[in-house]
Amino acid sequence: MAKRETSYELWLREEGIPVIGGFGVEDVTELPLKPWKRTGGRGAYIDLKGMEGFTGMYVGEIPPGGALQPENHLYEELIYIIAGYGATEIWSPGDNGRRMHFEWQQGSLFAIPLNTRHRLINGSREPVFFLAVTSAPLMIDLLHNVPFVMSSEYKFSDRFDAESDYFVPTNTRKEVGGFINWETNFIADARGALVDPSEAKGYGVKITSFDMGGSTLVGHIAEWPVGRYHKAHFHQGGAILLILRSKGYTLMWPPEAGIRPYQSDHADQVVKVDWREGSVFSPPSGWFHQHFNTGNEKARQLAFRYSGQSGKYLLGAWRAINKEGVRTSVREGGTMIEYEDEDPQIRADFEAAINRVGVPGSAGSK
């Protein structure tokens, strides 16, 4: 029987630009972008196996010296600038007199507040490339009325009311649910932003969650040393991981393969995703996944996800399978595999990988 399409999937097809699938994309800057009538630029949608109708993603291009068409929509959106510099003009529906303007550059990350009118402007003589993650699948599938989603005049003044300092970078960080959470609507350069120690996930690992635009769509920035790797864990689908620095690989495997997939003769179920700067991938619901740095510099990853524990506004559906949390061992009811419990083949393969490229490292040990 042919698979039926959701309202969101039908909309993607009607948009007239490529839709890229699979477990991951090695370099989003190399995708085949096509002219995009609705936005006035070029673009491609990315709909990976692990996104599962929770999150949407696309890559957009703004022509040199040009701008995209103004738009507003009833879904949340986070934008990361891959290349170029420019500005965003933003205002509430029906409030043209109070337009705000803020500038961005390569590495900038910001939220588009819910249902605000906005326009992205290229300030350079080269194309601007950006990656956007949205909650469009949830909203379009629930309402199945795209014109309403894209043309509502409702003003969410609790999210945005043209505050003069709305997009001024802040460094407000608080511990929320055991995580350091950064409350800001704009990060000038996510590639160099300060991240906080989080060694429960691995030796030398640093992770800082961020909360933008009053959204349930949030994320975190993770960094870990040369020659090291994260502990494996799982969570709900929909999380999207973008590599900002270094190179390496990620292993992903389904829950039925167990915590030691090689020992239990399930090696054929382990998916390996090689990554470098510009790679993006998404682990499916309940799949263990583990990140390995084989490069000669600290790895840095930008994650987009819903707020299950760390953010101000939580999405219950996203934390449904997270049990006691991604930083708690499976032995204690969580979803994380401690180094001593992992499949020995995993460390052996990693040590062989870093030895082949001459990268010093100590794998998961101190």
Briefly describe each language-model feature range.
Residues 63-64, 102-125, 130-136, 272-295, ...:
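Conserved metal-binding segment of the jelly-roll/cupin
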Residues 38-45, 56-73, 220-236, 251-256, ...:
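Conserved short histidine dyad/triad with adjacent acidic residue
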Residues 67, 72, 76-106, 116, ...:
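A short beta-strand-loop-beta hairpin characteristic of the jelly-roll/cupin
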Residues 2-7, 11-15, 239-241, 252-365:
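C-terminal functional regions that serve as terminal interaction/effector modules
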Residues 1-53, 145-220, 336-366:
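A short, N-terminal "cap"/entry segment at the start of jelly-roll beta-barrel domains
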Residues 85-87, 127, 247-249, 288, ...:
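Structural motif
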Residues 138-144, 309-314:
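A short beta-to-alpha transition loop/helix N-cap that caps and shapes the active-site region
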Residues 46-49, 67-73, 101-102, 121-122, ...:
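Short histidine-centered beta-strand/loop micro-motifs
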